[in-house]
């Protein structure tokens, strides 16, 4: 069984454990919505602790990608995603999941990220959110969403023996990576 939850809307503020029983002075409190909870100085020196939005700023600076180009790309991305959903192109890739809300059951079957109503004007009106004087906004970056996923991975024999009907099959895997400051 593999699972995970990310609740960006309810990420807590965290205070690290003090080094001694009754510390004097002020304690540092971390906002855990973006980035690391408790920064290890050695890890920070080696890899950085930038959030995804900050790494996008690093890439924009490194490759000299202007704000207008980012907004145009974001608009096209939203338009393509909305069109793909409308045309049913994700039908074979997304498994609708029933979720109980009290006595009612709803079917979660679509990503809420793509904005049907966005425009270049709306994107241009947004302020940078990750860096003073930056170019990455809430409209041209990945959204901060709540989400969860779980998977039960079993063999065909196990599924048959227990009357399980597969929702998906693992056909292949791949691994790739880049330095953390430009992910």
Regions found by a protein language model. Name each.
Residues 154-183:
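Glycine- and Gly-Pro-enriched alpha-helical subdomains that act as flexible
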Residues 69-161:
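N-terminal extracellular/periplasmic Venus flytrap/periplasmic-binding protein-like
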Residues 2-24, 94-110, 180-182:
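Conserved beta-ketoacyl condensing-enzyme motif
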Residues 57-63, 80, 84:
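Helix-loop junctions at the membrane interface of multi-pass solute transporters
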Residues 2-58:
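Flexible glycine-/small-residue-enriched beta->alpha junction loops
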Residues 59, 63-64, 159-163:
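Phosphate/pyrophosphate-binding loops at sites that engage ATP/ADP/AMP, CoA/4′-phosphopantetheine
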């Amino acid at each position: 069984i593999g699972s995970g939850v990310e609740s960006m809307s309810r990420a807590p503020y965290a205070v690290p454990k003090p080094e001694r029983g009754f510390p004097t002075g002020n304690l540092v409190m971390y906002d855990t919505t973006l980035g690391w909870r408790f920064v290890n100085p050695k890890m920070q020196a080696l890899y950085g602790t930038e959030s995804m939005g900050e790494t996008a700023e690093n890439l924009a600076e490194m490759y000299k990608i202007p704000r207008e180009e980012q907004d145009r790309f974001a608009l096209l991305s939203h338009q393509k995603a909305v069109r793909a959903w409308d045309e049913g192109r994700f039908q074979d890739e997304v498994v609708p999941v029933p979720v109980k809300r009290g006595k009612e059951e709803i079917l979660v079957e679509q990503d809420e990220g793509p904005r049907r109503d966005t425009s270049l004007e709306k994107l241009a009106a947004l302020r940078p959110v990750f860096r003073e004087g930056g170019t990455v906004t809430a409209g041209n970056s990945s959204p901060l969403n709540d989400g969860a996923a779980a998977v039960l991975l079993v063999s065909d024999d196990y599924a048959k023996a227990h009357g399980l009907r597969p929702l998906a099959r693992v056909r292949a895997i791949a691994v790739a990576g880049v330095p953390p400051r430009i992910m």
